[in-house]
Amino acid sequence: LADEYINAEQRFGYWKDAAIRLEGAAVWNFTVMFLNVWNAFRPQETDYTAFAPTRLPAVQDGVVQPYADSPLDEEPLAETVYLDILSQAQRYVYIYTPYLAVGEEMLDALKSAAKRGVDVRLILPGIPDKKLVFRLSRSYYLPLLRAGVRIYEFTPGFLHAKCYVSDDRVAA
């Protein structure tokens, strides 16, 4: 955490992020995923029950499927989720990310979705916090633009948000 995250300090201009509020069983799932990694690197295990919910609110609307990448395995779970969103998109996929550092499979998936008529938009920072990653991100622009991907840069400050939104039905 840093002061720029709450715009108390403006090292990169206005800091733009995204957040959601979750309640219910998904929160416990995320807690367990965090504690699994936390405990793997601690000499003494943290007691999970200290963080267990005492009550769960009634389900409102929608479905939340918790997932997380972990340094404890080789499974690229988040990438698999993102590739699935791109392959199933029919109308649009909007992606906000501060760092576009992708492999060939993801690059191909972005281009393929655009070529089959999906409105693929990337929203990236126009002001870098990490210059090397900023240059890497921009190195993908030309092949993506040629495939029909629309690329926007957030310039009032630094875009730190990380979101995939597709077809009014799924977000990550």
Regions found by a protein language model. Name each.
Residues L1-A172:
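Charged, low-complexity intrinsically disordered terminal segments
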